[in-house]
């Protein structure tokens, strides 16, 4: 039997307006090489100037994970050659990172587990190589974008724990509003380090790094494949031959990892302090300001459960993303019932989001859903009719009130109309009326169902209940 040992390195782009060492824009998706300057291009004589907003965001992250934020940290040069790295070195932090010794708690299989975070350090992103048929082009718009590299301890033991850790980390970054953490745009990138060892063995064996992972689904698949590959190599007696320190890429079509290059040790990067940048000394005022944090996911969950009476499982769905929590907060701020807000957001709306549509891109915004819930609460429509309204507004950009009128779904609350149907139902079921009066109370539900059926679902259920009780 084997135990899996996993450590994760996450590169998170910080959402500053300008790059970490110059004033070029960090906007995504613009024409190649339009956000560059002598510093980005590594022209002789161009000197870096540190973006203090990046430092503030790093401090906030450190405080959020209960880490040590070093008042003094140092930038180093990480030396390597690659076409998208104009200086032939990357400015990073090696000897003294800005954040170290943090922690994060995940929940897997109902169990809470602590995952240590070794360090989080600031560095600059590289450019991007675009490979065409017979040539490669380099876009340096991304070069110099501020990154926070977050390195976990090797505390993760399977792919489920790894994904839970990444999702928790992702949500913290979003709730802190220090990164958009968009995996598709590359602002939340993950490298996975995987090794195996016999159960009970404390030794750390050869680790393999996996790159090219841009979704939680593929991260899980890559880990599972790599663990299986290493176990088979061990069992076949080929572990030393087939498992060595290397970087592998994940093929998202074949769902396998493939060798890319041998993995470098830190010594090969020849780190040394960057002579162009002074040590970072964080002033007390900046430390104090950046330590004021917004409400984080776990705090929100606790508040929802305690103050709003929401089930813990529902609260976990709501805090699963910043957009979900913001949507829910909008409903509560609009004075919607927490119970109805949970049902209509987590069950009805989420159940209708398909084909890549997210809560952020949903055709039904929080204002529209709030109006729908209001119409349920004030008795204008039934919950059943509200589902029809939601189906309609998912496909048509119309307001809730006009759709209710158009589809004729307004509830009937007129006593005389309801009483006429009640009289008809009771008359047609006189034998059951006698049984009810002799003590068969459960028949009340039958009468309610018959009245609602005759009213084609347009009657107000509360009104039907009250009038039936008075009649019986």
Swiss-Prot record:
Its EC number is 6.3.5.-. It is an enzyme of class 6 (ligase). One of its GO terms (molecular function) is asparaginyl-tRNA synthase (glutamine-hydrolyzing) activity. It catalyses: L-glutamyl-tRNA(Gln) + L-glutamine + ATP + H2O = L-glutaminyl-tRNA(Gln) + L-glutamate + ADP + phosphate + H(+); L-aspartyl-tRNA(Asn) + L-glutamine + ATP + H2O = L-asparaginyl-tRNA(Asn) + L-glutamate + ADP + phosphate + 2 H(+). InterPro entries: Asn/Gln-tRNA_amidoTrfase_suB/E, Asn/Gln-tRNA_Trfase_suB/E_cat, Asn/Gln_amidotransferase, Asn/Gln_tRNA_amidoTrase-B-like, GatB, GatB_C_1, GatB_Yqey_C_2, Gln-tRNA_amidoTrfase_suB_CS. The keyword ATP-binding applies. GO terms for biological process: glutaminyl-tRNAGln biosynthesis via transamidation; translation. PROSITE patterns: GATB. The keyword Kinase does not apply. Keywords: ATP-binding, Ligase, Nucleotide-binding, Protein biosynthesis. Belongs to the GatB/GatE family. GatB subfamily. Allows the formation of correctly charged Asn-tRNA(Asn) or Gln-tRNA(Gln) through the transamidation of misacylated Asp-tRNA(Asn) or Glu-tRNA(Gln) in organisms which lack either or both of asparaginyl-tRNA or glutaminyl-tRNA synthetases. The reaction takes place in the presence of glutamine and ATP through an activated phospho-Asp-tRNA(Asn) or phospho-Glu-tRNA(Gln). Heterotrimer of A, B and C subunits. This is Aspartyl/glutamyl-tRNA(Asn/Gln) amidotransferase subunit B. It comes from Campylobacter fetus subsp. fetus (strain 82-40). The lineage of its organism: Bacteria, Pseudomonadati, Campylobacterota, Epsilonproteobacteria, Campylobacterales.
